[in-house]
């Protein structure tokens, strides 16, 4: 009975992880643009 819970956790974490990576990349890009790189 643990597998459905694990599946839910994984399915919940994947979008959060992708969103976090996207935000981090966007902030880095914006900061680089401000520095004129």
UniProtKB/Swiss-Prot annotation:
Q: Where in the cell is it found?
A: Cellular thylakoid membrane
In Swiss-Prot or TrEMBL terms, this protein is called Cytochrome b6-f complex subunit 5
Keyword tags: Electron transport, Membrane, Photosynthesis, Thylakoid, Transmembrane, Transmembrane helix, Transport
Transmembrane ranges, per UniProt, are 5-25
Offer an example of a GO molecular function term for this protein: electron transporter, transferring electrons within cytochrome b6/f complex of photosystem II activity
Q: Which Pfam families match?
A: PetG
Task: State the organism's lineage.
Answer: Bacteria, Bacillati, Cyanobacteriota, Cyanophyceae, Gomontiellales
From the UniProt annotation, give the residues forming the signal peptide.
none
Membrane topology (UniProt) = Single-pass membrane protein
Q: Which residues form a coiled coil?
A: none
Describe its partners and assembly state. Answer: The 4 large subunits of the cytochrome b6-f complex are cytochrome b6, subunit IV (17 kDa polypeptide, PetD), cytochrome f and the Rieske protein, while the 4 small subunits are PetG, PetL, PetM and PetN. The complex functions as a dimer.
Keyword Thylakoid listed: yes
Family in the record: Belongs to the PetG family.
One GO cellular component assignment for this chain's record is: cytochrome b6f complex
Xref: InterPro entries? Cyt_6/f_cplx_su5 (IPR003683), Cyt_6/f_cplx_su5_sf (IPR036099)
Q: What is known about what this protein does? A: Component of the cytochrome b6-f complex, which mediates electron transfer between photosystem II (PSII) and photosystem I (PSI), cyclic electron flow around PSI, and state transitions. PetG is required for either the stability or assembly of the cytochrome b6-f complex.
Q: Which GO terms describe its biological process?
A: cytochrome complex assembly; photosynthesis
